[in-house]
């Protein structure tokens, strides 16, 4: 694999890292090793959290988590020049990038189903994700292979520009989905009288804001042209965001279960429901948000293991 001639972590868009900085090499290895460790833990957590392995929430979580594996291995091979076959790391990191990034968006979309009942908004969100696959994933992939195989200044400049565009686009996409979720959670917070439920919702707000700040940090690093740091840190941050998703799921289930066990707090005639979340969607099809029905809560909770490890 070809390499650049300077030692700045902002270079090495093509080829391996051939600089003399031990710090950069340690940083690369650390970020990607943490990501790989988190992948193993995530897969175990997913299979122990979900009792029924179905629904878009389960599959998007599993696919996005698994995607971190080829993404991280691809960049390890690329930056440490572990093979002369350029296509091997490029293919691994590209497949991993597609599944990791868009998989995370589908995770957020699936979770949005738990609190948002507006079908028109949900369809628009799904359409946005699909459109961004076409306008962001496809051209970036083409430029990735073109830049690394041709190594021409024009193709490298094109890839460098597209890298910033796609990162910004996907960060905006995740911010929009998280924003809709935060909006609904905030509305629910004002309507929730139960103190424990309010505390849970506040924790969900903090988790979502933390994920947004992670995306902002990635964008700052990218626009500072620290390519090596941005691409390797991305794997770590996405693994952390997915682990936070597991925590969010646990909070949602705990709150729903607690409210189900409080019949005195429930008054269907007055329009009061035992939970702020349509928990039926967790263990079933997430493509269609069902109207909130109180008689479904107890049965639907069987679809989740409450002893998340």
What are these regions, as identified by a protein language model?
Residues 1-133:
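Membrane-proximal first intracellular loop
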Residues 53, 116-122, 181-202, 249-276:
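Intracellular signaling interfaces of 7-transmembrane GPCRs
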Residues 112, 116, 120-182:
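Membrane-proximal helix-loop-helix units in multi-pass membrane proteins
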Residues 40-43, 105-109, 178-182, 245, ...:
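Alpha-helical transmembrane segments of polytopic integral membrane proteins
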Residues 108-115, 144-149, 247-259:
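A cytosolic-side transmembrane-helix exit/cap motif
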Residues 254-309:
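Intrinsically disordered, Ser/Thr-rich cytosolic C-terminal tails of multi-pass membrane proteins
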Residues 22-35, 79, 87-101, 140-141, ...:
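Extracellular loop 3-seventh transmembrane helix
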């Amino acid at each position: 694999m070809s390499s650049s001639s300077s030692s700045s972590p902002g270079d090495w868009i093509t080829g391996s890292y051939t600089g003399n900085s031990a710090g950069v090499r340690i940083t690369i290895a650390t970020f990607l090793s943490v990501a790989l460790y988190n992948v193993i833990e995530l897969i175990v957590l997913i299979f122990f959290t979900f009792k029924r392995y179905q629904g878009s929430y389960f599959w998007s979580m599993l696919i996005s988590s698994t995607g971190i594996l080829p993404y991280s291995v691809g960049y390890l091979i690329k930056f440490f020049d572990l093979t002369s076959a350029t296509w091997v790391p490029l293919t691994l990191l590209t497949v991993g990038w597609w599944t990791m990034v868009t998989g995370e968006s589908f995770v957020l979309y699936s979770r949005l189903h738990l609190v948002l009942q507006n079908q028109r908004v949900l369809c628009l969100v799904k359409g946005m994700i699909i459109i961004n696959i076409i306008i962001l994933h496809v051209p970036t992939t083409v430029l990735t292979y073109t830049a690394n195989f041709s190594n021409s200044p024009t193709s490298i400049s094109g890839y460098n520009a597209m890298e910033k565009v796609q990162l910004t686009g996907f960060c905006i996409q995740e911010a929009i989905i998280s924003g809709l979720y935060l909006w609904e959670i905030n509305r629910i917070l004002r309507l929730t009288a139960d103190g424990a439920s309010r505390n849970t919702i506040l924790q969900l707000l903090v988790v979502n804001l933390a994920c947004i700040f992670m995306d902002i940090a990635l964008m700052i690093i990218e626009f500072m042209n620290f390519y090596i740091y941005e691409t390797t840190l991305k794997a770590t941050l996405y693994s952390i965001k997915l682990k936070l998703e597991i925590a969010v799921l646990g909070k949602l289930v705990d709150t729903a279960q607690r409210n189900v066990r409080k019949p005195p707090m429930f008054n269907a005639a007055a329009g009061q429901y035992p939970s702020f979340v349509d928990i039926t969607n967790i263990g079933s099809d997430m493509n269609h948000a069902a109207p909130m029905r109180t008689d479904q809560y107890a049965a639907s909770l069987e679809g989740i293991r409450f002893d998340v490890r």
